Amino acid sequence: MLRAHAPLRIAAALYLVFSANAALGQIPDPGEAAMAMVPEKNLCAGPTAPVAVGAAQWNGWGRDLENTRYQPEPAIRAADVAKLGLKWAFGYQGGTEYGQPTVVDGRLFVTSSAGRVYSLDSKTGCTYWTYDAASGSRTAVIIGELGQAKKAYLPKKLKHTLAHLDIIKAPSAAFFGDDSGTVYALDAQKGTLLWKTQLDTHPLARIVGAPALYNERLYVVMSSTEEAAALNPNYSCCTFRGSVAALDIASGRVLWKTYAVLEEPRPTRQNGSGIQEFGPAGAPVSSTPTIDVKRSALYVATGSSSTGIGQSLTDAVAAFDLGDGKLRWVKQLSRPDGAASSGFTNSPILRTLASGNQVILAGQKSGVVYGLDPDHGGEILWQAKAAESAAGGVAWGPAADHRNLYVAISGSMAQPANKQGSLTALDMKTGIARWQTPAPAPACTWGDRSCSHAQAQAVTVMPGSAFSGSLDGHLRAYSTIDGKILWDFDTAKVFQTLNGVKASGGPLDHGGATIVNGIVYINSGNTLLAFSVDGK
């Protein structure tokens, strides 16, 4: 079955199996590779400055609380996108998967599947610090200011003698999750550990979606590799349940945790190998939660059941109370045949229409895109079929400006590909397609074998241009007016890197482009690429 998938899908599937077996103690954990990595060579000169959260940034997965993936102030004109050239390349040590870059206050933060977390200068690419986590990570980092100093940050001898606590500033923190279900908080300036919390003890739990941050709380979702482990007939499937939790940002203390499968797993039957099976289970949450400040709500999109036992929160968009985590409403969007392609792997997007009404936008693996009403229990306002079949629908997520939703479609994963990937602009109010641009014929530097033009990567949009990556390694910019391709760069090549690491690009998947201060950042292979107008 793996032969029918595009190259990065094969890598992803193998990574799932690798991680699952590692958790079961059969092979080494990939995070162990981080301990053998050497220090970076291109260290920044001089002392590091404190990191302040500002307006010109891309913080976390979707850039804003609503997960729009829209950069309103890119410092690049759409007319100049065609002039983008490579500014620099940075090579990652170990691993082949990386979190989407976060850029805040002139600093770039990124995680890696080898466990190393990097803080770079966003303009020059020099290294401020690295931190080696115990397990691999592929979430985006989110930066938060911890505010005025808490008691935990004061020297003990000053607890009762300091007259004005507000003169002491606690550090900004870099938050991320890893493949063991652990959440980390690092000092964003120095890279030292502030705290870490094991959020889920299931051996196959992992955090894929980046945390969301609001009002001194960190909201974290949980996914797993159990679907891959279930391919092993000797594995007792399945007991993992997706969840969302709120943590105190200063201490990492869990304030509440709500499961997407409400019932605890129970013994169900024995499989053909005589192994006891369990259920209900599943509903992994693989994408960053969306914050609705107006309604004090948190929106998450869930995956499918892993046992076939029906549950109301599988294949759904659900709203939870920000304060206590209680379920507000759920809109289940399963296919009638219960196929796994009904699940979601991308974040809901909250957008305000010209009328002042708001809509929740969500794309399904089946290729169906929905507009939901946040004021009436997720009632379907419209739905649109963005893909011709369920073979390859919406993967890591659309982006939305003030007018359109830009949806990338994987098309067919079969080899040879018989259906193209595409980028489609849908009217946010009606779901009607304004334009659709099919992916160009796949052009892979490694040849025709396992070459796909599927567009699974998350989309990024700025005024006038939308960026979408393809599994053939090409990053393209499209006109938001008519879908015309404005710029095309093949990332699947060998690059000379700032830090001397041998690096090359490859298929583009998962995290999309990050745009800040006139620079477009993208991960490809084991390379971080930075583009600017004329490469300057």
Regions found by a protein language model. Give the residues of each.
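Blade/loop signatures of beta-propeller domains
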Residues: 27-86
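Extracytoplasmic mature domains of secreted/periplasmic and thylakoid-lumen proteins
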Residues: 209-210
